[in-house]
């Protein structure tokens, strides 16, 4: 079998709400446990792992978004334990020299609760109509670990509002709260970091601006891959879908990603990978599933 486990924030910093990093100790303990149960593989080894998936147990450890703390903490822990690791990075932040909308929104949520954000959004024309048409099933599937009101807010911003409207609203809120105090250079990996990881074969693509690829803006995929191909010694072949649920992935986007040279793409469909694996929709767990998904817990702890 093959399991893939994804992560985002890693630090000892604590937020009251909105962002819930794993600690360095948690990740190191996770690495030890996974290493004792699986062969930890690199992106370059995924082809061989899939070929032998019915005869051996493999694990790929991934991080999305290319955050600076991932390089400074997660990569160093992986080096310490002599295991490979994978980082899927965006690229618009290097072009604009500011935080991506998705990360501005996450930081807003550390100081504003769901009601405060909904009240703010409700003042914008057309937002209330969008809220009425939200599909609860899609929300729960995408944001299973959020309360319903926050899940609605996140789904509205990330999927339902036109991108320019969502960007405008979030940028306005972010500016009002944080001003210019948070720099992109302090938040994301540097170009040197990416190049160092790319030489090791640890870099994949994650979309230029972190938009869902179901929005039909396939230039977001192209810009990201073109950007990374200029930095890496080998062409980018691995892609992590932003948000990763079935509603965030279109068949047209898969076709386009293949045309751009992507051979393996990773969803957030929480399941193991066994036989008949769809190479463009490889299943992936979230790190939260280590404690909350009974199937995954049984596999890791009891080898079932």
Predicted regions and their residues:
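Short active-site segment of divalent metal-dependent hydrolases/proteases
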Residues: 67-68, 209
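Short, flexible loop segments at the rims of nucleotide/cofactor-binding pockets, characterized by
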Residues: 19, 63-65, 180-185
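Membrane-embedded segments
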Residues: 70-74
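Generic enzyme active-site microenvironment
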Residues: 62-63, 204
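Metal-dependent polysaccharide deacetylase catalytic core of the NodB/CE4 family, i.e.
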Residues: 5, 10-11, 81-247, 282
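C-terminal active-site subregion of NodB/CE4 polysaccharide deacetylases
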Residues: 1-62, 69, 100, 106, ...
